[in-house]
Amino acid sequence: MFKEIKNITKNYAIAEINGDINSDILNINVVIEDNDLRILGEVEDIDNGLVKIAFLGEFHEGKFYSGIIRRPSLKSNIRIINTDELKELVGENDDKSMLLGLSPLYNNYPVKINIDKMFSNHLAIFGNTGSGKTWGVSRLIQNLFNLNGKIAFNSNIFIFNNTDEYHNAFSSINKYNSNFNYKMYSTSRSDNKEGLDLKIPLWLLDVDDYANLLDITDYFQINIIEKMLCYVSAFAKNDQDAIKYKNHLIAKAIISVLYSNQVSAKIRDQIFNILKDCYTDELNLDVQVPGVGYTREFRKCFDIDNTGEFVERILVTAYIQSFIDNNTKWSEEYTPTYFTLDQLEVALNFTLISEGLLLNEKSYGEAIALKVKLHTLNNSSNKKFFEVNQFMTLDQYISSLILFDSSRRAQIINFVFDEIDDRLAKSLVKIFSRMVLRFSKMQAVRGSIPIHIMLEEAHRYVQNDRDSELLGYNIFERIAKEGRKFGVILDLITQRPTELSSNVLSQCSNFLIFKLNHPADLEYVEKMVPNISKDVIEKQKALQAGTCVAFGLMMKIPMVVKMQIPNPPPTSSNASIYDKWIIEWNNK
């Protein structure tokens, strides 16, 4: 079949072949033997009786090692790999391996992957719409739950998607084993939806979470959020200390305005604006201010006489100053405690008056933007996602997500962000990702509870946005760089890799690339994916639906892999226009 080698370069050998050989050997692996040297190659091109063979690595004592040190001589022999060598390349059939798919080049020979090498590293899955990407993901997870003699009982796979397309594929995983369970949380407002209502405890969100949730545009707003959280923590108990603190803040804010260099009418308007949003039983517009032998309604104290002065300036000033307590050391630390969006909005209002932010032209825009966004959230249908009935810690919350019932756990938790806008969905994915990373860092034994964060339509979330500029980091970049140490792994699934953060993509170690057509996507993947070759890029151009090029730490060499049809499949197929539009018609 193969004749003598005509030429050897750094990475290739050019050899003659018999004239009756056709293109069936294209992409087939061969072994080039030169005494004790056995080099693995792949037939990349056939032209006029010559084949171009790319060097991939070497076999030593039956084991394959990527890369070569020595080149073969021109006298070397070339043959197609044998069964033992093929087994070495497609993975070992042992307890730590699982089925990935089948090799169409080798008569559907099973391709096995090491579970650790696959699931301990970040994964990227690319492919056009209709390339079989979602079906491939479904089959990959189904294979994990269909091992022989062992079960993935302690697996934790958090799926984030804007549709429930994976529900059909995973809702019946207990058919593999009764210990397997699946949960779905949904943001749908439909009464007929499947899945549980999504609920997120507000006190588990940190400053950066609120920065994303309220879509900040300036670093200055982070300081406002920090102060807001301190106040909501201090006010949450609503005890005498909390009331005294509120009175202290209101009184200081009013006094600062009262003694400002402004006309009386403007001072009155600003004080009334303060008390419109921030008030207590003791300090409000309707409270009776006691004088000597009489009382005066608070708002009436600010009536202006014909000299332009307040009629009860001395009386009201003394009353307000009686609530200022500069001797008490008020807590400036945020302690997670139960609170609601209503209480958070109150805390923000106190933050704005205590810092005088609404009276400062430079800070007014950023301050009022936060106020409007929080008020909008608190008065929208999205408020229900943050309505939790009782306090729980982060550990308890993550456990509640995983817990299936009082005695069983779920292995797959599917978060479906439907009927909400993309901005909120992106914020929620970031919030959950931060929670998962914090939870994993809390564990006494590092990496003891591995969790996969699977992002369908990953380009919606993992972007080159302003988080690095405003917060100093991007949560997905942080997980990509340090998450593996703590068992937090990203799975990025997208048809638009050009929109992914390059810093995150460069940290991925495993890849399943289904068919991609757009030149910009192909160029980006070739540029950003570590160790990808032009040959891999060329291979994926001719892939059938449901077939991918698999490479990375999980594979010995890049291989074309045919993913088996998932059973049951996801609901990701296109609508059947013929069935829905076309009817029988007998026009007589």
Predicted segments with their positions:
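Glycine-rich phosphate-binding loop of nucleotide-binding enzymes
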Residues: 99-187, 253, 502, 550, ...
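P-loop NTPase motor domains
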Residues: 164-171, 199-475
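The conserved Walker
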Residues: 129, 468, 497
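Conserved ATP-driven motor cores of ASCE-family P-loop NTPases powering translocation/secretion/packaging/pilus
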Residues: 471-472, 477-562
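Loop/turn-to-beta-strand initiation segments
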Residues: 154-158, 409-412, 448-452, 486-491
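Long, basic/Gly/Ser/Thr-rich N-terminal segments
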Residues: 1-89
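Conserved P-loop NTPase motor module
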Residues: 545-588
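P-loop NTP-binding catalytic core
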Residues: 61-122, 572
